[in-house]
Amino acid sequence: MFSKETYVGRRAELKKLVKSGIILLFGNNESPANFPANGFYPFRQDSSFLYYFGLQRDGLVGVIDVDNDVETLIGDDIDIDDIVWYGSVDSVKDMAGMCGVANTAPMKQLQAICGNAMKENRKVHFLPPYRHDTMISISDLLGIHPSKQREAASMELINAVVKQRSTKSQLEIDEIERACAIGYKMHTTAMRLTKPGVTEKFVGGQVDGIAQSYGSMVSFPTIFTQHGEIMHGNPSMAVLESGRLALCDCGAETMEHYCSDNTRTFPVNGKFDQRQLEIYSIVEDCHDLALKLSKPGVKYLDVHMGICRLMTDRLKELGLMKGDTEEAVRAGAHAMFLPHGLGHMMGMDVHDMEGLGQIYVGFDEETRPNLEQFGTNCLRMGRRLEEGFVITDEPGIYFIPALIDEWRAKGLHKDFINYEKLETYKDFGGIRIEDDLLITKDGCRFLGKELIPYHPKDVEEYMSKN
């Protein structure tokens, strides 16, 4: 964890932003894989609890009494049975000292703390829960049914957390750079191992092992597939075939729980064919345009629309699209090929803070999502960029047979899409290129000391040498 002063400072700023009431920040509990007495999923602490307290043990709740400036770490010390099986851990009091919290209390006192606050008509702030055990706790403590908890969550607290966590400190940037360094090794390992005859599972398993070997974990389930048209195509036992493209979307999460997230698409046999190169070069140029346009004050929605126009122009040159570019993009015809947004915030969550509500993280009062239009409704980030933001730049082009068939049968966007030509690409798959960007004072830069090869010649050269 960082120094205790880091967490003291973060909580002090949180109190200023929320102004009054009592804040509950729930840590996560262990999650049993089959039954509670034996076998848990790998523990992952709640990111907002980590941000303000830095403690990675299960069964903790942070309570911040804003009005009286009192902070309490709630939790129970483990008993001898736990010590026998899992070893000794720090006491709750010792953990409180690590993050600069003066007071501790056992879990049974949380009910009284919340009950007294409600009797005094004080606001009890909590974030939208995403785990069922947390929902049950909120129901028991505050009497709010789980189905009503998302709408009852504190907007003051949500806005404060988003404001603080959106702008990354140098400590956080350094951690993300560490994650990117591991991510580089993961991706270059995938490039080295990819060849005809090996399975997706083999490559994906080796990639995950790289993260584990650095004391890290994957920042999300690794995507490695020769069906790149499937957005979240997890590795299968399919054998890699010459002439196909392999798409690898993976990242690492450091021991301080900061993430990386990159995507590369490369030829299974190490050499792009002409048709693959034509599509790849469009995605490459869209990726580089986003890099050029992203800077403080620019709306990421405008960057997204800029790459959509470039993509449409280039697909028209290949005969896959037609008509007026502006009209095609306005109508959403480009979403046949790009049914998602350009990128998202990244930090302690790979899709940073989206559990708080995407509309509060990636948008603001000025920029709102278009929830009615296919493709655009998947835009995760549209707000104006600010110095210190960490975002992803991940354009792609996908040829999804089911989507092609559905749109063609309905006659959708027939003035903008050349369905006859498109039919010949049904076996193509998909291409995505993704990098992590830090918004700087006057532009942006790649995160990671070493850039994973993505220009076609660099990809081919790396694969041929390794």
Can you describe what each PLM-predicted range is?
Residues 1-466:
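Active-site neighborhoods and metal-handling regions in enzymes and metal-associated proteins
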